[in-house]
Regions:
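Feature marks proteins synthesized as precursors that undergo proteolytic processing into two chains
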Residues: 1-210
Length: 210
């Protein structure tokens, strides 16, 4: 399955650089500690985790998924409520991201490992994809819906779909949020908006970035 370049590490680095008073290493210390020393899994998370495990054990048979089970279901099951879950590999990864301001993830050792595993398992993600990526600072787009300014991230994000759907719905009056007519109009707006986006906005965005 093709995957996109993960953007979170670069976002952590950018947010820390622009707004933080502490180093990224200091900010990520608690996450590293939880990963290394472990934390008790809550009942809600345990249930969600177990549901995912039950689904994955029946569907993810390929050898490429074995590391997932080795990491998140070491004893052949999802962690039980109150069980201490830890991952030294996660701790080391977070430390490398923090120490290099995320450069290790996109341009260094972690990027090499991602590339190697992707090639080994028939994936498409390459280190060149990682090297060519860094998060962007963008101006939000917005609409005014019944007196409220609703802001979203512009394309290539999907927030514009929600804004367009709200613009469609501005032309209608609603009295009961649970009535069939209200739900029907909301569903139709959410069906129409993506069709318009796919047919015009995405094509325009792609052309501008070729």
């Amino acid at each position: 399955i093709p995957v996109m370049v993960p953007g979170a590490p670069s976002a952590w680095a950018e947010l820390s650089e622009k707004f933080g008073r502490l180093t990224l290493e200091k900010v990520m210390e608690p996450a590293v500690t939880y990963a290394r020393e472990g934390y008790p899994v809550s009942p809600v998370i345990s249930k969600i985790w177990n549901n995912a495990y039950k689904e994955f054990i029946d569907t993810l048979k390929d050898e490429s998924f074995k590391p997932w089970f080795d990491t998140f279901a070491r004893d052949g099951h999802a962690p039980q409520p109150g069980e201490i879950w830890k991952s030294e590999a996660h701790a080391k990864t977070l430390e490398k991201i923090a120490k290099t301001h995320a450069k290790a993830f996109y341009q260094g050792e972690l990027g090499d490992q991602i590339d190697a595993y992707s090639r080994k398992t028939g994936g498409y993600l390459r280190k060149s994809d990682l090297e060519n990526y860094w998060c962007e600072w963008v101006k939000p787009i917005h609409v005014n819906y019944r007196g409220y300014d609703i802001c979203e991230i512009p394309p290539n994000g999907d927030g514009i779909i929600a804004l367009m759907a709200l613009n469609i719905l501005k032309g209608y009056s609603f009295t009961d949020r649970s009535c069939v007519d209200t739900v029907h109009k909301q569903l139709e707006a959410m069906k129409l908006a993506p069709a318009v986006i796919d047919g015009s906005v995405r094509m325009s965005f792609s052309a501008e970035n070729e």
